[in-house]
Swiss-Prot record:
Primary gene name: vbsA
Upper classification of the organism: Eukaryota, Fungi, Dikarya, Ascomycota, Pezizomycotina
S-S bridge residues: none
Protein name, per record: Versicolorin B synthase
Induction comment: Expression is positively regulated by the dothistromin-specific transcription factors aflR and aflJ. Dothistromin biosynthetic proteins are co-regulated, showing a high level of expression at ealy exponential phase with a subsequent decline in older cultures.
Source organism of the structure: Dothistroma septosporum (strain NZE10 / CBS 128990) (Red band needle blight fungus)
Subunit note: Homodimer.
């Protein structure tokens, strides 16, 4: 096999979402050296980067923070289940308090050891992003599949979920932004708590983030990024947020074209204003130019600053245990087949994610009575909302060939990937520093033309979402939805739906958390979402047909091609090729105490029991307008502050 072919497999940029799964297995049979390519040395650092490389260190003995596994009568003030986005933030903040003892239970391990550079190099994001049938790494992902999705031609979708320290911050697209001010006002209204308004959220957003502005690294003159300094704090941290070192060439063309459609320039999508266009920030360390995760930030600092945190890796939570007063007092766990328990003196906090937090609630006796009784689980608290209200969206759009360099070259280009690896190893420059999507725009639905909706659907959106909440998110995706393997340059003008009405669920058919839960997002099950999907696609196509983008587009639309014109044809293409946003929320939703569908109160406490909270994306009452990672970090900061304050 040619070296260029092996290198191409090693990089696995945007893998075309679905068609990659159809590639011949013979291709993969010849890649025994793939691991060495992925784990090739990552080159020299400058002096500043060398000091910030995220190595695992501790205040005292590093080993004091791990285990001991299986010993009886281990007891901590707080026991946190899940070492992901929220779990590690909670663990750091609670362990900072003198006298607090904290245990963190994580089913996975360290992603650096389990997945190599696939989790470190920004553009290697897509190495295991999709299940193509030939390359899997169950060490750091749960390999969860959905029920057949009727709205997506009955596809059973792989749903990426991190099983590692860092959780999905080690798996996702690194996109960092915040919701609109109206979204957080809606949150405050739905849970009956004014501490969820934008002004009250902002300090929690600021506390966790160490922002490096666009001048940290040089940017092209035609790729100006503007930020609202009031959105950030100079004392924030530990999570690095910055712009990728490389600016995608196509992004400046999209930026210029959208001027003609009336898009205003906004200040980075983190000051509560989304409607408009901007380059977008990522959780990338601007000095090492590597992925930043909850593990490389919160955990690394906690290990150095505190002796109050114990971590149990490769340890699966089986269920939460309660005393006679329905107070959570322990977590039953399993390590390599051995069952034991970790006791909690104050609280148990579930941060296992949108699928596994509701699963743990149900196997512990908290959930819909009918579901629990079918599995002979004693009902501790009948909460019909557990596992319900799942919300996520999809990403879709047309693909065009272009005359400027794009990440699609990495698939099949004989020279592009070796050059990019050399650039990254020796200079921390080039295509591998950017995960392939750095320019976004948000828009309300139009009143007429492409992007417009029926009066009925538009009225439903207006009635259910705030005025500053966008209908669509547009993304200049520097690659293809279906891989081409020819080394040519393509880009996909993509869209995600922000005002969806489809609602799915998470359930169980087993009492064993070793078994994956049942997950049914029900994408495009609501006709209004189907209408929005077609309208968003047509709007993307309208952008690419503008004269400015025609100057850089090299020929006719590649996918789906101009023969797809009717609504049914476009919807069919979307159903076959669109992918998950991997941003599910809402399956253990906050709400008012008198709401029978609420699972949590506004302090993230599970209703009907004591000493148990859920803090992660499942806690959201609804999907906010955009990527949830920034809000999950802030929610963890907020609830940790509540706990420390005695709430």
């Amino acid at each position: 096999m040619a070296l260029s072919t092996i290198l191409t497999a090693a990089a696995m940029p945007v893998a075309g979402l679905f068609a990659f799964a159809q590639q011949s297995s013979a291709f993969f049979d010849q890649i025994p050296v793939l691991g060495s390519m992925l784990n090739s040395p990552v080159g020299t650092y400058d002096a500043q980067a060398a000091q910030m490389d995220g190595r695992i260190q501790a205040r005292d003995l590093l080993s004091s923070h791990f285990g001991p596994v299986g010993w009886p009568h281990q007891s901590f003030d707080y026991v946190i289940v899940g070492g992901g986005t929220a779990g590690l933030a909670m663990a750091k903040r609670l362990s900072e308090e003198e006298g607090n003892s904290v245990a963190l239970i994580e089913a996975g391990g360290f992603y650096e050891m389990d997945a190599g550079n696939a989790t470190e190099v920004p553009m290697y994001l897509f190495n295991y992003f999709f299940d193509n049938g030939y390359m899997k790494n169950p060490l750091f992902d749960w390999y969860q599949y959905t029920e057949p999705q009727e709205g997506l031609h009955n596809r059973e979708m792989f749903y990426m979920q991190g099983k590692t320290l860092g959780g999905s911050t080690a798996r996702g697209a690194m996109l960092y932004h915040r919701g609109s001010k109206g979204a957080y006002q809606k949150w405050a209204d739905e849970v009956g708590d004014d501490s969820y308004t934008w002004e009250k959220w902002l300090p929690h957003f600021q506390r966790g983030i160490k922002f490096s502005g666009p001048n940290t690294n040089p940017r092209p003159a035609n790729a100006t990024a503007v930020n609202d300094d009031k959105a950030w704090s100079a004392s924030g941290g530990p999570v690095h947020v910055a712009y990728p070192y490389l600016t995608n060439a196509i992004s400046s063309w999209v930026d210029k074209a959208l001027d003609s459609f009336g898009f205003s320039n906004v200040q980075g999508f983190s000051n509560g204003v989304l409607l408009g266009k901007s380059y977008i920030t990522h959780t990338i360390n601007p000095f090492t130019r590597r992925r930043e995760t909850a593990s490389s930030s919160y955990l690394r600092e906690a290990l150095v600053e505190s002796n109050n945190l114990n971590i149990y890796i490769r340890t699966l939570a089986k269920k939460v245990l309660f005393d006679e007063n329905k107070k959570a007092n322990a977590v039953e766990v399993q390590t390599d087949g051995f069952k034991w328990k970790i006791e909690a003196k104050k609280e148990v906090i579930l941060s296992a994610g949108v699928m596994r937090s509701p699963q743990l609630l149900m196997v512990s006796g908290i959930g819909p009575k009918e579901t629990l009784e079918k599995l002979d689980i004693p009902v501790l608290s009948d909460r019909p909302g557990v596992g319900q209200n799942m919300q996520d969206t999809i990403i879709l759009g047309p693909t065009n060939p272009i005359r400027v360099e794009s990440h699609s070259q990495l698939l099949g280009g004989k020279d592009t990937l070796p050059r990019s690896i050399d650039d990254y190893n020796n200079h921390r420059t080039g295509l591998l520093t950017n995960p392939g999507q750095d320019f976004f725009a948000f828009e309300k639905h139009a009143e007429e033309g492409p992007g417009s909706l029926s009066k009925e659907t538009a009225a439903d959106i207006d009635a259910n979402f705030p005025a500053d909440w966008p209908t669509y998110s547009f993304i200049a995706l520097d690659d293809t939805f279906v891989p081409q393997f020819n080394g040519k340059n393509y880009f996909s003008m993509s869209a995600a739906l922000m005002t969806t009405f489809s609602r799915g669920y998470v359930s169980i058919n087993s009492t064993d958390t070793l078994d994956n839960p049942i997950v049914d997002p029900k994408w495009l099950s609501d006709p209004r979402d189907q209408e929005m999907a077609v309208a968003a696609f047509r709007r993307c196509r309208q952008f690419t047909q503008h004269e400015i983008l025609q100057d850089v587009i090299d020929g006719e639309e590649l996918l789906p091609g101009k023969k797809y014109q009717t609504d049914d044809e476009v919807l069919g293409y979307i159903a076959e090729t669109s992918d998950a946003y991997y941003a599910g929320v809402g399956t253990a939703a906050m709400g008012k105490k008198d709401d029978p569908k609420a699972v949590l109160d506004s302090k993230a406490r599970v209703l009907g029991v004591q000493g148990l909270r859920v803090v992660d994306a499942s806690s959201f009452p609804f999907a906010i307008d955009g990527q949830p990672m920034g809000t999950v970090y802030a929610l963890a900061e907020k609830i940790a502050a509540d706990i420390i304050a005695g709430n």
